[in-house]
């Protein structure tokens, strides 16, 4: 193991000084030892990928390596795995699989890649390799979710190994790395389509749904993260037990899926986006289950009520492991809910959220939209969404939505929606002016809508009355941005700050070739958009 006294990490939007976290602790709360282990896991995954490719492994023979690539890349996302013991175990499993592949194929086992080689590479090479690596982490998260529902794509799995192996090429320059970055976006589009199909074929097609923010009296559990499969398992095990279930954060869109909303004890949504959890959970008389990411170091006020599962882990927290068949026993979580008892009386929280405007729902009213635009009743669309975060500059997105023309519609997705989804902006032609399309991976749905509208108007996507205003925080946002660039979508407004890992040289390419635009103020940006 390397030097655990210091770290280097600049993969998230809140990285220290907009340059990188160094020293003993990162802004996200992970310790230097954790950051070092995450780098070691990544370096081991590069070695596994190189060994798998040398062995010419494909299909089912590569299944264990594929699963480790998904799990390992996911575990190194921001706000996922803070547990050194869990990461050390993962590292050992990656090494064991690499050695097994090498032995069975009679090829040499590739050595671990030292991430310091990447962090200390020439500026533009470091920037482009970081785009590839962080994009792969986001892509792997979506592949992990699809695989949990039994949906896999060999082309996606194969590319994870291809992309990882490419990181070890110290001679790769911009001519190699920029196309590779865009290929991450191409494969991520394919993976988001896979996950969309997995979700809709398993849980039904999302439909517009109103979700209460109030909590009923009695025992309950709050589920955070993104994992619909884990939520379904918990709903099955709590049915008839007198324990209600509430979503949090990115799981709000779960209420729109027919196979989930049929559970009478899936009651509503507690709280808002991930960065507010230390306040929102402080006095909660219920346990919280974290699925996938969005975990912050728990405050002492509620640490004894935190459960984790899947790739999420934190030292000292109860972790629910998956059985070999994929099942999970949530009985300890349920018992904790019964012990805590919930609220003695229903909360007086007012207001509702509306979700479920996925691509099927929006395309179902496409004729209305097209007619409204042609008749001048609708000036256009704004897609305002992405990751939320704690930086004060994120108030931009609420201000932007409030100042957008009254005859425009706001599409939104991911947890960035919580900046403004409490607003009542009225309707246009019977359509709500704010339409929540779902989780971050539902960017695929937004792309489908854009392509369909372009066909209806007989124009290119860039010619539509559609502007993308995106907030980013972690690596899934990177993979989505790369998908949009792969599709040739131009004029994307990005904020609240630019990624620290994007060098001036790479930024120049993004601005010149793709017209990526750092946000300024809502007033100035709207003036430019509407000119």
What kind of region is each of these model predictions?
Residues 45-205:
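Electropositive, gly/pro-rich neighborhoods at or near active sites that engage anionic ligands
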Residues 2-34, 38-39, 46-47, 57, ...:
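Anaerobic metallocofactor- and corrinoid-dependent redox/one-carbon enzyme cores
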